[in-house]
Amino acid sequence: MSISGIKGMNDILPSDVETWQFLEREAHRIFKLYGFAEIRVPVVEKTELFCRSIGETTDIVEKEMYTFDDRSSNSLTLRPEGTAPVMRSFIEHKLHALDPVSKLYYMGPMFRYERPQKGRYRQFHQIGAEAIGVDDPMMDAQVLAMLCHYFDAVGIDNVELHVNSLGCQECRPQYRQALTGYLESRLDKLCADCQRRYQTNPLRVLDCKVPACQEATKDAPSVLDLLCSGCNDHFAQVRQHLQELQIDYTINARMVRGLDYYTKTTFEMVTNQLGSQNAVAAGGRYDGLIKELGGPALPGIGFAMGVERLVLMKGEQQVQPPRPDVFLAALGEAAGQKAFALMYRLQRLDLRAEMAFTGKSLKAQMRRAGKLNARYVLMLGEEELASGQAQLRDMDNGSQEPIALEGIEQALLEKTRGN
């Protein structure tokens, strides 16, 4: 009996990997343009880290984390998101002492025990970025500009930027009170999850996708009406900077985030292409998180993108693997040995070279070269070995010409690099 993979944890097959690598490669390129440096953190952290950062009453902590005790009875958790581990590393290694402004990015797998569906999996991958040490609204705008730049670079244009402000410790309690007062008379219209959220995390009721809950909250008070003057000014400046950069955005006062650490600016990149999983990137400011985790009182802002959702959005634009530069078709044992050694030398010159390893007919080898979409085929047999000249076929136009075996590596290098 064969062993299958774990539900909601998917294999990334070679036919898809090129698209994944393209998305990752563009993240490296774009983020470095904005002064961000990559950081890599473990996939397992102490459970306490996520309880203190994400919030003990969030859906993630209450229902979705993969948590276990190790053999020393330490409670550990597979990371459900990337910001908290990056902040833990930032504090532990005192990165603020090296530079008062830290701009970091990461990529890798995250884990949540959820019902698998399109765009939502139990192991999923994120690309994220964090800017620490600056509370200026201009930094919010730069992070959003970088995110928009990335989407342009990877060719995903059917997205909209939604922005909101969740206020701060001074004004959010007033909004929470206004919202719970509004919801109190409508509790019977809320789903079971939202009735629980009413007690623990009422802002999350606004994010519920259940139609009855959306109807019940359609006239709920707006957080933007209860911002303190500082948060109101901050949000106004963020919007002004976005306008200066000619970045389109939509104010979405109902947009809340599922993690407790967010303050002030929050945002999402949304699409209508993925059904209910309409956010392909999301983030916000978290000015109290680092202090909450035992570090200095430093502000921060960041975001994460779901790579699986980006891949889905690429759709028909899937990135194709690079074609082989040369396919070596050999007939006979001596020619096969010569081709094998030549293939290695070509690969050492950074040429993509392939050959058939089982003694197939020339016709079969040509079919293989065609399937691989090789640019050239080098045909080598006993006659070619004796004459010192092989045959080189251009697979794009069908032309064929002799090519000397002496110095063939340099000749093929010039030939392929010239096309």
Curated annotation (Swiss-Prot):
Entry annotated with the keyword Manganese: no
Broad enzyme group: ligase
GO molecular-function terms, A-Z: ATP binding; histidine-tRNA ligase activity
EC number: 6.1.1.21
Name of one Pfam family that matches: tRNA-synt_His
Subcellular location(s) of the protein: Cytoplasm
InterPro entries named among the record's database cross-references: aa-tRNA-synth_II, aa-tRNA-synth_II/BPL/LPL, Anticodon-bd, Anticodon-bd_dom_sf, His-tRNA-ligase, HisRS-like_core, HisRS/HisZ, HisRS_anticodon
Reaction(s) catalysed (UniProt annotation): tRNA(His) + L-histidine + ATP = L-histidyl-tRNA(His) + AMP + diphosphate + H(+)
UniProt keyword terms in alphabetical order: Aminoacyl-tRNA synthetase, ATP-binding, Cytoplasm, Ligase, Nucleotide-binding, Protein biosynthesis
Annotated SUPFAM superfamilies: Class II aaRS ABD-related, Class II aaRS and biotin synthetases
Cystine connections: none
Chief place of localization: cytoplasm
GO biological process: histidyl-tRNA aminoacylation
Gene Ontology cellular component annotations, sorted alphabetically: cytoplasm
Gene3D superfamilies per record: Anticodon-binding domain (3.40.50.800), Bira Bifunctional Protein, Domain 2 (3.30.930.10)
Family of the protein in this entry: Belongs to the class-II aminoacyl-tRNA synthetase family.
Subunit structure: Homodimer.
Database matches in HAMAP family: His_tRNA_synth
Protein name (Swiss-Prot/TrEMBL): Histidine--tRNA ligase
Organism this protein belongs to: Syntrophotalea carbinolica (strain DSM 2380 / NBRC 103641 / GraBd1) (Pelobacter carbinolicus)
